[in-house]
Amino acid sequence: MSRPQQAFPPIRDQRGEPHVRRFDEQRWLIDNIIRANGIDWDQPRSLYIHAPCGIEANADFAGIRERVKKMADIGPAFAAVARRREAKANAAALADHKVTARDNFFMAAVHWGAAQWPYDENDETNISYNNKKRECYAKYAALADHHVEAVWVPFKGKAIPAWLHLPPNYTSGKVPVVIAVPGMDSYKEIQVALYGDKFLNRGMAVLAIDGPGDRKSVV
């Protein structure tokens, strides 16, 4: 039995493949959707990015949700909050307020990572946000209430970037390890909570990676 013809057959390119347009060429569509539905138009991104930070970040994300009216607003909105958190962290570090510094370096790293999301090329902005994210997270790691270190996992002649978290009060010996693999819209810096992480609190280590082709793996 023959298949029914499509009412609207795809437009094909010179190779005979369906002609598609790049995301940027259709930006007006997503801008209209964001204007109507907000930053969480397709998934609850502001919620899962917020969650690892805890309640202190409530105002950060409330302000970001209010400011984002189009795709081009996302990066600058998160970057502005990241700068504010980083400045607060640096001031706290100078005053030897280690917990305040630690918490704010963590939140700054989270916001820098979120600011990267709209950029699909390794341009100057994306790379600078990535560097700030890694710098802030390294400063958080130095002050964390458990051991955190940067590691690189060998992969097909290259290496996958990761953060290794050991459970609180770890001294020596083997422990179970959870490998946290974020999706394309996520990143390794939000895979372990600032407080009360469900894996670390159960005595497990966490290896949080950026998968091949994503975030630092690309940069």
Label every model-predicted segment.
Residues 2-74:
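Long, non-catalytic architectural segments outside compact domain cores
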Residues 76-78, 82, 127-171:
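N-terminal cap/lid segment of alpha/beta-hydrolase-fold proteins
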Residues 86, 90-93, 100:
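Hydrophobic/aromatic side-chain positions at a characteristic register within alpha-helices
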Residues 86, 112-119, 137, 141:
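A structural signal for well-ordered alpha-helices, especially hydrophobic packing surfaces
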Residues 94-98, 140-143:
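Flexible helix-coil transition and linker loops at the boundaries of alpha-helical arrays
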Residues 98, 102-128:
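Short, charge-rich amphipathic alpha-helical segments embedded
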Residues 171-219:
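Cap/lid segment of the alpha/beta-hydrolase catalytic domain
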